[in-house]
Each structure stands twice: as C-alpha cells, then as structure tokens.
C-alpha cells in the first residue's frame, strides 16, 4: 500500500512528538511492506514566522492532495497579538472547513497503568472509563456569524450558534455507527431547555435513531454531562454533541484518564481523508527539552492507519507497543509516579519502537 501523508509539525513540542510518531510509522511501513510518503507542511505559528500567514495556500493544497494529515500542535503566546484571522488556531479551523472534516472522534479510555495519575477516586476508576466523544466540527458557534458593534454608545458582541439539519444528520450517523460496534449506547448532549439549535439537534437525532433501533439513545443537558463525566464516567459509551460543547467536554474527559499526553484524536471527512493529532497543546514551556509525551501522537498515527487506511493489524501493533512500554514502567514526566522509570520524549519513542520492529 502506498499513502501520502501531509505532516504538520506545528509549534512548541509539535516537532518532538511528530518525530517519534514518524519513527514508528516508518518502522511499520518497513515491516509490512507499505510505502508512506511524508510531506512537511507549514501551518500555525511556524507558518506565520516564515510566510506571514497561518495557513499558506501551498500548505492547504498539499493537505487536500494527501491521503491523510498528521499534526503535532499549533499555537503559543508568541502569536497572541496576531489578528484573529491570522492566529495559529485559525489554521486548524480553516483546515477542518476546507477538508470537510466534520467529525471529531476522541476516545477517553483509562489505561490501567496510569490509574494513579487520575484525579478521580479509586471507587470511580474501578468501574472503568471507556467512552468516545463524537463532536461536530465545522458548525456551531465557532463558525457562525461573529459581531462586535457599538449600540447606544457601548460595545456589544455576539456569536451565532448555527446548525443545519443536514449537518446534524451527518454527525449523528457517525456516532450511531460507532455505537453500533460498541455497547450500543448514545447520549446526545445539548442545552435544549434554552437553545433553539439544541432543539433542532434533538429533532434530527430522533429521526436518525429510527434507522438504528438496536442503539439506545438518551439526552443529557451539557451542564449535567460535565458533572457526570467526573462523577460516574462508566455510564457513558458514546457521547454525541455539537462543536463547542464537545470542545469543552472532551478536554474535561481527557484529564480524568490521567494525562492529556496519551490521548489521540481523529477529525474525519465523508471519505477516507482525516486529520490526526494528539489533544494536548504546543506546551511552549517544555518545548525543546525532551520532556514531551509522544504517546498521544503515536496513538493518533495508529488511528490514522485504521480509520483512513484500513490497516487494522498495523494499528493494533502500535497500540500494543504503547501498552508494552507502559507495562515495563516507562513514564514521561506528565505521567510519572513512584517506582516508575522517568524517560524523555525520544527515549519513550525508542522503547515503543522496540516492540514494533
């Protein structure tokens, strides 16, 4: 198999973690006789520094022509004073929109080796944490109309949370298909007691559910969901929600699993094209110090192999290699606990690589 992968190192620790993921992917390609062609793409703060814009047209074109995109992280305080249309984060929004990446898939799974790093009590952790958040990615308040105007002598700002029925239907089908292959439970999270857009979500999701009689659907207000994720996360299997709610809840879900450093994510289109990235930020405070955790990026690469390329066996090899490294007690600083062996970003990549080759 030959696949072309656009690689966005991005900012901060992005280059460090991506370097480790590429090392693993190259080993997988050699072992299973695949050809992965990697093409570096400028985006985010690095692109601003070099080209003056967060997402050069050349970068966008390369991503469109690729089979998948692998991203490290973008952003940092260095670019905080850039105008809103040219902030590093704007590159991500543009990529999602232009590539049609409407579905964000983010697992929240407690790795047993990291249970001590979770802030939750043992009585909660013992019930297990294993759910997926399916977040609509190119609609809602992030892409609605934004206004800043002066009315009666004072500034007034507004941001529109806009959704069409077709947008909701598309993401709902993704969630139901995922749930059908898991425990067949979906909780749709909204704020239907207040928001018209949430009421439309319920109307459309109810219709989609008619084609998935084997999947149990329930609804939960977002404020309650935020509480329940910490109080009783074992109740969840698949959470379906809109863009902003999903952004907030998925970050909350990541920390209860012990560390954001190990969590991957996928942003998918209607076809096989996807963008894969760890959920952590660019962490400029530790950039260049070999302290970053590469596991989230390595697992993102594993998701890419499975979801975009259909290479399930190869994906499982990477996942097992990560488990082996943790079983042996290797930990980066963010997940360190007593009795474990502290390693840096590069060494963690090397340890995982040993189980792949």
Swiss-Prot record:
User: What gene name does this entry carry?
Assistant: leuB
Describe the function of this protein: Catalyzes the oxidation of 3-carboxy-2-hydroxy-4-methylpentanoate (3-isopropylmalate) to 3-carboxy-4-methyl-2-oxopentanoate. The product decarboxylates to 4-methyl-2 oxopentanoate.
Q: Which GO terms describe its biological process?
A: L-leucine biosynthetic process
Q: Which family does the record assign?
A: Belongs to the isocitrate and isopropylmalate dehydrogenases family. LeuB type 1 subfamily.
SMART domains per the UniProt record, alphabetical: Iso_dh (SM01329)
List the GO terms this entry assigns under cellular component, sorted alphabetically. Answer: cytosol
- In which organism is this protein found? Helicobacter hepaticus (strain ATCC 51449 / 3B1)
Its annotated compartments are:
Cytoplasm
Residue positions annotated to bind Mg(2+) are 223, 247, 251
Cofactor binding annotation = Binds 1 Mg(2+) or Mn(2+) ion per subunit.
Q: Where does NAD(+) bind?
A: 76-89, 281-293
Question: Which cofactors must be present for this protein to function?
Answer: Mg(2+); Mn(2+)
GO terms of molecular function? 3-isopropylmalate dehydrogenase activity; magnesium ion binding; NAD binding
Q: What Gene3D superfamilies does the record point to?
A: Isopropylmalate Dehydrogenase
The protein's name is 3-isopropylmalate dehydrogenase
| Subunit-structure text | Homodimer.
């Amino acid at each position: 198999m030959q696949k072309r992968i656009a690689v966005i190192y991005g900012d901060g620790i992005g280059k460090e973690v991506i370097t480790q993921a590429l090392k693993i992917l190259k080993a997988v390609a050699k072992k299973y006789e695949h050809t992965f062609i990697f093409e570096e793409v400028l985006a985010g703060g690095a692109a601003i520094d070099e080209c003056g814009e967060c997402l050069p047209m050349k970068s966008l074109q390369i991503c469109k022509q690729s089979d998948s995109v692998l991203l490290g992280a973008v952003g940092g305080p260095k670019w905080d004073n850039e105008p809103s249309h040219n902030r590093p984060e704007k590159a991500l929004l543009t990529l999602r929109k232009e590539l049609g990446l409407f579905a964000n898939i983010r697992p929240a799974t407690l790795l047993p080796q990291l249970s001590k790093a979770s802030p939750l009590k043992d009585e909660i952790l013992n019930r297990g944490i294993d759910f997926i958040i399916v977040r609509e990615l190119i609609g809602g308040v992030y892409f609605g109309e934004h206004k800043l105007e002066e009315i009666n002598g004072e500034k007034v700002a507004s941001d529109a949370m806009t959704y069409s029925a077709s947008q909701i239907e598309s993401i709902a089908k993704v969630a139901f298909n995922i749930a059908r292959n898991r425990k067949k439970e979906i909780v749709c999270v909204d704020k239907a007691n207040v928001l018209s857009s949430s009421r439309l979500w319920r109307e459309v999701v109810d219709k989609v559910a008619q084609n998935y009689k084997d999947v149990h659907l329930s609804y939960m207000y977002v404020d309650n969901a935020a509480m329940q994720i910490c109080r009783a996360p074992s109740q969840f299997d698949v959470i379906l929600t809109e863009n902003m709610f999903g952004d907030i809840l998925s970050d909350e879900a990541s920390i209860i699993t012990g560390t954001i450093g190990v969590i991957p994510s996928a942003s998918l289109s209607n076809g096989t094209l996807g963008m894969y990235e760890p959920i952590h930020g660019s962490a400029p405070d530790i950039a260049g110090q070999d302290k970053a955790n590469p596991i989230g990026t390595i697992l993102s690469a594993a998701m890419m192999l499975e979801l975009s390329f259909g290479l399930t066996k190869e994906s499982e090899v990477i996942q097992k290699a990560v488990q082996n490294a943790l079983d042996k007690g290797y930990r980066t600083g963010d997940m360190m606990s007593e009795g474990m062996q502290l390693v840096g970003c590069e060494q963690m990549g090397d340890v995982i690589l040993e189980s792949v080759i």
